[in-house]
Amino acid sequence: EFYPIHTKGKRKRNFTGLTQVKNDGIRILVIALFYEQFKIIKYGRKSIMDKTVHKLLNQQINKEFYSAYLYLEFSNYFKSKGLDGFANWYMIQAQEERDHAMLFYTYLQNQNQTVTLESIDKPDPSISCHMDVLKAGLTHEEYVTGLINNIYSAAYDVKDFRTMQFLDWFVKEQGEEETKANDLISKMELFGTDPKSLYMLNQELAARVYTAPSLVL
């Protein structure tokens, strides 16, 4: 209950309304602050991330999963041709791309950013011979390199050093991926037309084993 506030010997002035508004405002502010603190405790403090950088990182999850699908398609092609070594090489490529997708996924979650999973397109490469697969693989890696560079550039523009540090690993990784794809093309050009040499190359690729990514989040 509120009472009029006045000073002895002076004309009475009623501050009841102003006093109540002030008290109500304080209550609202306290409740708002409490709610914000509750959200921080429950969900964690949300880091500030540029909208463009966030969008590109989220899209890259989809791109990496598509890469895994594409390499599974390549593995399936070589399996159907009886070249299990080539099939193994591309199966491991698919596993690596899946790992890359999860690294982007985990990074966004660790920054308390929203992750939106998009539908994955069906791979539809034009393949008429073994070399088509290898060249398509190189072209795709060059495409992914461009995507990584684009995200890095966007992060640099807004001085998002944390994201730049995260992407450093992928910049190096893409250089290695392009080198591997080029090397495989060179070997196929040298040995692909000779059945005995192709058999030996297939055996070499069959020896490849999966290695988990060195980047740990």
Task: Please report, for each region that a protein language model flagged, where it lies by residue.
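Iron-associated oxidoreductase/ferritin-like identity signal
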Residues: F2-K10, N14, L18-L217
